[in-house]
Amino acid sequence: MIRNDIEIDTKIKCLEAKMTQQQLGEAVGTTGQYVNRIIKKKDGVVNKTFVQMMEALGYDIVLTYEKREVK
């Protein structure tokens, strides 16, 4: 089980950074529409097989986010 809601976290981080989904998409080499599909859970971020493997091994997945310092 993934204990984070990655899609919601992405939306929140966009808002905190004052970045649109279009800008985020361009920053990672994709489109704002694709970012929107991820946020709306139409396309998953995490590979389902990876999650199943970790669950079979007895693990939950917990992600942490650490803001990098701008140099």
Give the positions of each predicted feature.
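DNA major-groove recognition helix of helix-turn-helix/homeodomain DNA-binding modules
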Residues: 48-63
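Recognition helix of helix-turn-helix/homeodomain-like DNA-binding domains
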Residues: 29-44
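Short glycine/serine/threonine/alanine-rich loop segments
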Residues: 19, 30, 59
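Helix-turn-helix DNA-binding elements, focusing on the entry/boundary residues of the two helices
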Residues: 10, 21, 32, 47-50
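Short alpha-helical "recognition helix" segments of helix-turn-helix
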Residues: 24-25
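Short acidic DE-rich linear segments
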Residues: 68-71
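A short, Lys/Arg-rich alpha-helix, primarily the initiator
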Residues: 1-17
